[in-house]
Amino acid sequence: MRRMDKVDLQLIKILSQNSRLTYRELAEMLGTTRQRVARKVDKLKKLGIIRKFTIIPNLEKLNYMYAILLIKVKATENIYQVAKVLKDHEDVKILELGVGKYNIIAHVLVPKDIKKAQEKVNDVIKEINGIEDLEVEFVSDIPKFELL
């Protein structure tokens, strides 16, 4: 993989905060040309460094919240198979694999109504085989969300 220069890193940081900026606006912020920004964005997309341009909705205003599933997969199970099942579930919006007490963390989009949220969590859990331990936490607010 090619080395990223200072402009690449600045570009990624700016886009992670506002992906709607035009190439002209980005060029002004970075002190370069629109053409150079366009080439850099294209290259970062081709390399898979920029995977998508998206928004961060206000879940509170949409009457939704996240249920965080902290999952410990049995040692006899394939963690990647469990992750694939979760990845394919339409309500799982963020999926993380890690090392520690829990080896999978899934963020499930659920209604704010706690009874409906519980039903949605149960729908996701019943699809998973090989759970050794599970904790569910509900996120009531996200005061900060930054990627870089």
From Swiss-Prot:
Naturally occurring in which organism (per UniProt): Pyrococcus furiosus (strain ATCC 43587 / DSM 3638 / JCM 8422 / Vc1)
Matches recorded under InterPro entries: AsnC-type_HTH_dom (IPR000485), Dimeric_a/b-barrel (IPR011008), HTH-Siroheme_Decarb (IPR050684), Tscrpt_reg_AsnC-like (IPR019888), WH-like_DNA-bd_sf (IPR036388), WH_DNA-bd_sf (IPR036390)
UniProt keyword Transcription regulation, yes or no: yes
Molecular function terms, GO-annotated: sequence-specific DNA binding
The organism's place on the tree of life at top rank: Archaea
Ribosomal protein found in the keyword field: no
DNA-binding region coordinates: 23-42
Gene3D superfamilies named in the record: 3.30.70.920, Winged helix-like DNA-binding domain superfamily/Winged helix DNA-binding domain
Residue ranges constituting the HTH asnC-type domain according to the UniProt record: 4-65
Keywords of this entry: DNA-binding, Transcription, Transcription regulation
Name of the protein this chain belongs to: Uncharacterized HTH-type transcriptional regulator PF2053
PANTHER family attached to this UniProt entry: HTH-TYPE TRANSCRIPTIONAL REGULATOR PTR2, TRANSCRIPTIONAL REGULATOR, ASNC FAMILY
